[in-house]
A protein has these predicted regions:
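Small beta-barrel nucleic-acid-binding modules, principally OB-folds
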Residues: 50-60, 92-96, 104, 142-153
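Conserved, short, structured surface segments that act as functional micro-motifs
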Residues: 90, 114-182
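"Short basic amphipathic alpha-helical interaction patches in structured regions
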Residues: 104-105, 137
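Surface-exposed, glycine-biased beta-strand/turn segments
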Residues: 2-6, 11-88, 95, 118, ...
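Residues located in well-ordered beta-strands
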Residues: 75, 101-104
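A broadly tuned, weak detector of single residues within folded domains
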Residues: 67, 112-113
Length: 182
C-alpha cells in the first residue's frame, strides 16, 4: 500500500511539473495591442458603488463579430453561455495550469474537451452578459488554480481595493503579462 502511494505521488508530481515546463506564448486574442488598457486589471471599484469588485481582467475592444483566438494552446474546459454578467464565454486550460477566460463573446466557435492551438479561433467579439450597454469587447482574464501566496499583500491596478479582496490576487493574474506590449 505504501508503494502505491509513493508511485501515485511521483506520477502526480511529474504531471504537475510537466504543466509548468510547457512554454507559454504571447498573442493577442483579437484586435491590436493598442485596443486595451493594460492598467485596467485590478482597477477598483469596477462596478458602481462601494460594493463593487476589482476588475479581474482586461477588456480588449473591437467590432462585434471580430475573430477571437486562443492566446495559448490548451484544452477547452468550458464553451457556451457562462451565465450572469459574463455572457458567452470560453475557458482554456493552458501551460503552467493557467485558465484563460474569454467572456462577453458574440458567438462561441469551439466546444468543451477540444484541444486548441495558439491563435485558433474560439469565438467572435461581442456584447453578451453585462456588456450589452458597453462598446463591444472581449474580457480576457487569467487564473491560476495554484495560489501565489506572496501576492496576498500586494496591491495592483490603478486603484487600491480593500485588503479583503487581496486573497483573489493569489489566483487572478494580470493578463497584460500574457499579451504583447503596445
Amino acid at each position: 500500500m505504501k508503494k502505491f502511494f509513493k508511485i501515485t505521488f511521483a506520477a502526480l508530481s511529474l504531471v504537475l511539473l510537466a504543466g509548468y515546463l510547457i512554454p507559454e506564448r504571447k498573442a493577442m486574442p483579437c484586435c491590436r495591442p493598442s485596443d486595451y488598457n493594460h492598467q485596467s486589471f485590478w482597477h477598483w471599484p469596477w462596478t458602481r458603488g462601494e460594493a463593487g469588485h476589482p476588475h479581474t481582467g482586461v477588456d480588449i475592444f473591437g467590432k462585434v463579430g471580430t475573430k477571437v483566438v486562443s492566446q495559448t494552446g490548451g484544452i477547452v474546459l468550458f464553451a457556451g453561455e457562462y451565465g450572469g454578467k459574463a455572457g458567452n464565454g470560453v475557458v482554456v486550460l493552458g501551460p503552467k495550469w493557467r485558465l484563460h477566460m474569454y467572456l462577453h463573446l458574440h458567438t462561441v466557435d469551439t466546444k468543451a474537451g477540444k484541444f486548441v492551438r495558439p491563435e485558433e479561433q474560439i469565438g467572435t467579439l461581442g456584447k453578451s452578459g453585462n456588456a450589452a450597454k458597453t462598446p463591444a469587447h472581449v474580457h480576457y482574464g487569467v487564473i491560476t488554480p495554484i495560489p501565489y501566496v506572496w501576492r496576498l499583500f500586494q496591491n495592483e491596478g490603478t486603484c487600491n481595493p480593500p485588503v479583503w479582496f487581496n486573497w483573489r490576487l493569489m489566483f487572478w493574474l494580470d493578463p497584460a503579462d500574457h499579451l504583447p506590449s503596445k
